[in-house]
Amino acid sequence: MLEEPGLITFAQTKIQPPRLRSGLIVRAALERNLHGALASRRLTVLQAPAGWGKTSALTRVLSQLPTGHAYVWIAADEDDDLQRFLACLSAALEPLDLAWRIAPRALPTLALAERGLRQVADEVANALASSEIERGTLVIDDAHRVKDPRVFELLRLLLESLPAPHWGLALSTRTVPDLPLARWRALDEVAELRLEDLRFDEQDVAALLAANGVAPDIASELARRTDGWAAGLRLLMSVGGGMGHGRSAAPGQRHVFEYLADEVLSAVDAELRDFLLRCSILPELTPRRCAYVAQQPRAGLLLERIEREGLFVVLLDAEERTLRLHDLFRDFLEDRLQRDHADELPGLLRRAAEHEPDLARAVGWLARAGAWEEAAQAMAERGPALVPLGGGPT
């Protein structure tokens, strides 16, 4: 049942950007690109998994906008249906003192009429066009939380109606939004910032450490260990930069594991979760290898989904679709695999070793599986051929 528009209530924090976090650093390239996108594009999309600093980047850049650039903020929630979203939107726009043709509080009711979404989009666009604002941005934070498809249909219609070049839309999201991005890319009307743009490099990590009173001598190792993941950096820094090179979780990494469990693994369905766990022993993921090791005939489709949803992976080879799991995520998955499916681990390791061209890696997996005879046989059969090349294990 839809809520009566007059009864829709929400916390004011939904339409207020979060306060800037202390210890943030200047990230010139990222901020320059985001500034440029917000100033000129019809749509700006920040897409990356949990904890990559999407909201922090947005709030920092919004705080630096010139006087003539206005913005409104909506933090999306799972229970935001169309009526609730429109109530938030009208409340967020209220401080701009727009010239509405209808009362903005009537938007949720108008949306229920025939062709209501088109009418709502036109009313909002006309109200925005009536303002003397030089440039404005509608910001939807955590857009992936919205489950009502009508909200994205409204956003599509609104994007087509926004008064250009004065207004644009910005989304932060963990998944690809349900919008016609391909068409807008062709028209050069969308700017997309992804994981690669948000990743902290070694210089960023050193600056972050210095800003938080931590010696920068561990910057290189932290950058490598976290792969530039903002949340991982914060969590490891909070416990003194614990690195934990062993297979068991160091105290600092336990915080990372808990975060991953809550924010990532619990959000995917059982099929994808089991696939990730069973493939976590592999340093590189390909459809053929994952299908064999995990005994999952849908491996190719699942890998496409993992890449599409940005689940802490890096694309190594587009032609063969070879992915690499983020180190911390892989550590977490292996830890969970050992805890919840220890009985399956020997079989997974044996299958992984069976077609592994790297002898040292194959022998290591067989040793972990307790398959000592098979490990010795692999050494006897393949080891001598590698000695002249200096490739044998030591």
Can you name each region flagged by the protein language model?
Residues 141-142:
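Walker B catalytic acidic pair
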Residues 208-210, 220-225, 231-244, 274-278, ...:
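C-terminal helical "lid" of AAA+/P-loop NTPase domains
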Residues 62, 86, 90, 94, ...:
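Short, amphipathic alpha-helical segments that act as regulatory/interfacial helices
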Residues 52, 56-135, 145-147:
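Conserved phosphate-binding/catalytic loops and adjacent sensor/switch elements of nucleotide-binding enzymes
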Residues 342-394:
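Extended alpha-helical scaffolding segments used for macromolecular assembly and cargo binding
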Residues 2-50, 56, 60-61:
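Walker A/P-loop-proximal flanking segment of P-loop NTPase domains
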Residues 6-9, 13-14, 26-30, 56-60, ...:
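Alpha-helical sensor/transducer elements of the RecA-like P-loop NTPase core
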Residues 1, 44-52, 58-62, 157-160, ...:
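C-terminal boundary/linker of central alpha/beta nucleotide-binding cores
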